[in-house]
Amino acid sequence: MGDRGGAGSSRRRRTGSRVSVQGGSGPKVEEDEVREAAVSPDLGAGGDAPAPAPAPAHTRDKDRQTSVGDGHWELRCHRLQDSLFSSDSGFSNYRGILNWCVVMLILSNARLSLENLIKYGILVDPIQVVSLFLKDPYSWPAPCLIIASNIFIVATFQIEKRLSVGALTEQMGLLLHVVNLATIICFPAAVALLVESITPVGSLFALASYSIIFLKLSSYRDVNLWCRQRRVKAKAVSAGKKVSGAAAQNTVSYPDNLTYRDLYYFIFAPTLCYELNFPRSPRIRKRFLLRRVLEMLFFTQLQVGLIQQWMVPTIQNSMKPFKDMDYSRIIERLLKLAVPNHLIWLIFFYWLFHSCLNAVAELLQFGDREFYRDWWNAESVTYFWQNWNIPVHKWCIRHFYKPMLRLGSNKWMARTGVFWASAFFHEYLVSIPLRMFRLWAFTAMMAQVPLAWIVNRFFQGNYGNAAVWVTLIIGQPVAVLMYVHDYYVLNYDAPVGA
């Protein structure tokens, strides 16, 4: 026993104050007594002082690791992971980079604006804007032309009124509608080409108004025709039975919709597609309307200022490279014009499709406010044209694309026909006000058909979106320079050459 006690004491000397966790009796009891005497010296005569509880295991481990200096997990500081810019990392928060892009864009444009002011001074002249609409203050051909459009609106109404009561046959009504709609296209064009006092800008506004009226009245004619066809089918099915109208007390049915009030509401409503019962908002929100009106005024002034201060000098400086056929300078002028042209186009989009159309819709309590969709996310040319101008897109689908399919055309022919109609109106709104026919706008629109195929075939995702943006940023300045160059040569350079 003495040997075992000596061995135990020597073991205690080697391990220091480390607590033994072995159980047992005999010599082990002596070790426990020695340990308790060392740890609890205050156990005295009374023996009633509580012994301190042993430290928890995790605390002892932590103390041991601190004293050693290196823990088990501190030996490893690397793990399997990808860099943030790698597609496999799953990281998507690039808000700081987006803010950096915005800051750089602001600084770059601020430098260009300062350079423009230093080079040209202040070119903004509100009085000059009036001269773009009127040559003679006593001759207002464009406003008079727009007022005269009421003749064709009334003619359409009278034709439909007589068709509803059977005073005209469908064939005669179709003939009268075709003549009326053709006159809507040809009459303002003839006035714009023959009347010398009308300005290009005034002619543009008049032709745009007549184009909108053409689309609206063609939709008005189609919907009323469909209502007559449905009425004939309903009579054949019901065999003269009257349908209860209790469920439709607040709706208008054909031919009760044939009133001047209904037609002129449609003429002023921000849509090209006619319905007998439009969705209506419950009230006019005055604050919303005031914001839209202020936006209209602000962005109108901003567009005029940017055109006069930024675009006009750039276009004027581009004429000499075009005359000399200096291709490097032409490309430089083209890229320089691309920035202000694209910025003005974006402002125009917001001004027209958000501010103006929402203001008109709020005044008329027109409920359908989907005037545009997320065209800026377009990954194809087709998606862009389907989403940037919803009123025109709805009209094309309803009154052009689907009727062509019903007549037996395939989808490719119908889609090409839609682009052809769009190309016609683009050329119509540009060539006639400028009084020259170069077909640049028509060619640019028809080029969208092969361009859409190329983008769909070779570009996907973000690359497709980038391709759409490139066509928007570069394509429009090319058309602008083409028309401005030809207009300049036709009106200013020809006498010098002669």
Swiss-Prot record:
Subcellular location: Endoplasmic reticulum membrane
Region ranges (Involved in homomerization): 1-96
Listed InterPro entries: Diacylglycerol_acylTrfase1 (IPR027251), MBOAT_fam (IPR004299), Oat_ACAT_DAG_ARE (IPR014371)
Pathway: Lipid metabolism; glycerolipid metabolism
Membrane topology summary: Multi-pass membrane protein
Basic and acidic residues bias locations: 58-68
Parts of the chain on the Cytoplasmic side: 1-92, 166-170, 233-284, 365-410, 459-460
Annotated GO biological process: diacylglycerol metabolic process; fatty acid homeostasis; glycerolipid metabolic process; insulin secretion; ketone body metabolic process; lipid storage; long-chain fatty-acyl-CoA metabolic process; monoacylglycerol biosynthetic process
Family per similarity comment: Belongs to the membrane-bound acyltransferase family. Sterol o-acyltransferase subfamily.
Record remark: domains: The disordered N-terminal region is required for the diacylglycerol O-acyltransferase activity and may regulate enzymatic function via its interaction with the MBOAT fold. The MBOAT fold forms a reaction chamber in the endoplasmic reticulum membrane that encloses the active sites. The reaction chamber has a tunnel to the cytosolic side and its entrance recognizes the hydrophilic CoA motif of an acyl-CoA molecule. The chamber has separate entrances for each of the two substrates, acyl-CoA and 1,2-diacyl-sn-glycerol.
Physiological role: Catalyzes the terminal and only committed step in triacylglycerol synthesis by using diacylglycerol and fatty acyl CoA as substrates. Highly expressed in epithelial cells of the small intestine and its activity is essential for the absorption of dietary fats. In liver, plays a role in esterifying exogenous fatty acids to glycerol, and is required to synthesize fat for storage. Also present in female mammary glands, where it produces fat in the milk. May be involved in VLDL (very low density lipoprotein) assembly. In contrast to DGAT2 it is not essential for survival.
Quaternary structure (record): Homodimer or homotetramer; both forms have similar enzymatic activities.
Protein name: Diacylglycerol O-acyltransferase 1
Organism: Rattus norvegicus
